From Swiss-Prot:
This is Phosphoribosylaminoimidazole-succinocarboxamide synthase. InterPro entries: SAICAR_synt/ADE2_N, SAICAR_synth, SAICAR_synthetase_CS. Transmembrane segments: none annotated. It catalyses: 5-amino-1-(5-phospho-D-ribosyl)imidazole-4-carboxylate + L-aspartate + ATP = (2S)-2-[5-amino-1-(5-phospho-beta-D-ribosyl)imidazole-4-carboxamido]succinate + ADP + phosphate + 2 H(+). It comes from Methylococcus capsulatus (strain ATCC 33009 / NCIMB 11132 / Bath). GO terms for cellular component: cytoplasm. It comes from the Bacteria. Keywords: ATP-binding, Ligase, Nucleotide-binding, Purine biosynthesis.
Length: 297
């Protein structure tokens, strides 16, 4: 048997399914472990699209593993080191998720998205145009679209249910949710991870404009980096060679899909329309190109 080229939804009868997210299927794998399967599902405008992107889940898994390993000295992460066969002894089930599964520690997720912005783009640009600030953090006047910020900003948000939008919150609200010590640690770690990763990526021709981290804690209250790590899904990657402030750069992600969907008369509610083969292929290649540049593989 060979692993399937695309996987829209996993089916592992030997493990209890805990949750299906927009992209990931999460299974319980004993008292202290979970299995995260990254599928090829793609969401746009908070709606899951009906067509998988070939190989996307494997790219996201390899990129996450790369960053978890590279930045492990900054903060513990959720990787358990347990081999896949230890939780999936059935070869057929293992084959189904090979290359797209991670056996991780069971941790308590924190109810905050740790967003770090290094460039003025997206909702941050709209906020700045309106108020001269991003998420309440004042910035110098005269900054242009996509301009590098004087320093990276920690702009946390709530974790919304699937189908809803995250909402930006102030640091005091983070303190109210998880306590001051943990909030300050999260901010320090998120900014440190971003700065180191952004410098590394820039040397390889990629600008990390912004990214989203998720964290959890173990029973001792120790902060861990969980979920995914600096992937094209959780981050805005731009090619450095074409970067010019004042112009919105192309992204190494699902921009082809978003641009195509904007040409349709679709109300951005389920069910989503099917995607043409060329859009699927071009999107898959963008994900692979980001991986090649970052990891050299």
């Amino acid at each position: 048997m060979t692993a399937p080229e695309t996987l829209f939804e996993s089916s592992l009868s030997s493990l209890r399914l805990k949750a299906r997210g927009k992209v990931r299927d999460i299974y319980e794998a004993g008292d202290d472990l979970m299995l995260i399967v990254t599928t090829d599902r793609l969401s746009a405008f908070d709606v899951i699209l009906p067509d998988p992107i070939p190989g996307k889940g494997r790219v996201l898994t390899r990129v996450s593993r790369f960053w978890f390993e590279r930045l492990k000295d900054r903060v513990p992460n959720h990787l358990s080191g347990t081999p896949l066969e230890a939780v999936l002894p059935d070869p057929a089930e293992r084959e189904q998720v090979e290359g797209r599964a991670m056996v991780v520690k069971r941790l308590r997720p924190l109810p905050v998205e740790a967003v770090v912005r290094g460039y003025l783009i997206g909702s941050g640009w709209k906020d700045y145009q309106r108020s001269g600030a991003v998420c309440g953090i004042g910035l110098p006047s005269g900054l242009r679209l996509a301009e590098r910020l004087p320093d990276a900003l920690f702009t946390p948000s709530t974790k919304a249910e699937m189908g809803s939008h995250d909402e930006n919150i102030g640091f005091d609200q983070v303190v109210g949710l998880i306590g001051r010590e943990l909030a300050e640690r999260m901010r320090e770690v998120a900014l440190g991870l971003y700065r180191e990763a952004a410098a590394y990526a820039l040397d390889r021709g990629i600008i990390i404009a912004d990214t989203k981290f998720e964290f959890g804690v173990d029973e001792a209250g120790v902060l861990h980096w969980i979920d995914e790590a600096l992937t094209p899904d959780s981050s805005r990657f731009w090619p450095a060679d074409g970067y010019r402030p004042g112009i919105s750069p192309p992204s190494f992600d699902k921009q082809f899909v978003r641009d195509y969907l904007e040409t349709l008369e679709w109300d951005k509610k389920p069910p989503a329309p099917h995607l043409p083969p060329d859009i699927l292929a071009r999107t898959a290649e963008k994900y692979r190109e980001a991986e090649r540049r970052l990891t050299g593989e």
